[in-house]
Amino acid sequence: MPLPTVVLRRLVSAGTALSALSALLAATAAAAAPQPLRFVLIPKVSHLWYDVVREGAEAAGAMIRQQTGRLTQIDYQPPARSEVELQAEILKEAIRSRPSGIMIDLLDAPRLRPLLEQARRQGIPVNLFDSEPPDGLPLTSIGNDFCKQARIASQRLVERLGGKGEVAIMQGVPTAPNHAIRVRCHQEVFARHPGIKVVATPIDQDSIAIAQQQALATMRLHPQLRGWVVADAGGGIGIGRALQTLGRAGQVQVVGIDDLPEMMQLIRAGVVDSTSATKPRAQGYWSILNLWQQGLSAPTIERIDTGIVVEGPASRGG
């Protein structure tokens, strides 16, 4: 027997009300759900060293998800080349996208300062890893004492050479704060030893391939060269490859920076003496935690020092 029209109307009305209530409850639940976090990681260039930084950042993101239930994305944005113009464009786009935070390894602190200030004005948490802030700009720096790291390396080279001989410094990216500090501190150590003469300071632009090319050219131009120090992670690897190409492994002393797998292989093979290394995974991890805490209105701190480790015979006093 068909239901009366009035009953049908009441059923339809009840169904509509239930649908509206369900939609309202779903919207309320969605609004109450924690919003995802997105942190932008901007290195100097695509590089194996930054892959390790990224691993540390991802580990911190996983910890935040575990503790808060919030989805956390690490948006890795490397410039195609280590050029400040490219890094500036990436930073501009990152600011426009209104992320939960930006961590950046500066290619040129003064030139990027206006963009860093813009991000701060817009309330976007920002910090620097493996770098130093522009003068007077209160940003947290996550990394190590770059001057101490360089002094460890250059003093080791002086000892290996008995305080005498021609040496060269591979510069990395001269405008990058950490590279510039290392070069200056290498030079300060060598200046205290009259028997040491710096004959070349080539630039590798944070590229292993360019470091190899520059090292080959430098050693052909200076056949009496006895030793190398570097300002970046790829420099020592490129020099090691050049020594192998020239058949001069063991004849020219090299003290590197950082402990990428190929660097450690070169040390084990006796091509590179030792290395004064940063801790890139720790830098990535603590950079993300610092950005997250900034988003929770934590006060700004000046520095998070992730330390230095010496690898190779120098670590054993050999």
Task: Report each predicted region and the residues it spans.
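N-terminal export leaders
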Residues: 7-13
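Hinge/cleft segment of the Venus flytrap/periplasmic-binding protein
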Residues: 33-35, 178, 189-190, 279-318
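Extracytoplasmic "Venus flytrap"
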Residues: 38-61, 75-88, 105-109, 171-180, ...
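Short, solvent-exposed amphipathic alpha-helices that sit
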Residues: 52-65, 149-153, 177-196, 210, ...
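Short beta-strand elements in bilobed, periplasmic/extracellular small-molecule ligand-binding domains
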Residues: 63-81, 166-171, 187-208
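Hydrophobic alpha-helical segments within soluble ligand-binding/sensing domains
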Residues: 87, 142-167, 209-212, 259-263, ...
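Hydrophobic alpha-helical
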Residues: 101-120, 186, 200, 204-265
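Flexible loop/hinge segments that line or gate small-molecule binding clefts
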Residues: 110-148, 166, 260-268, 272
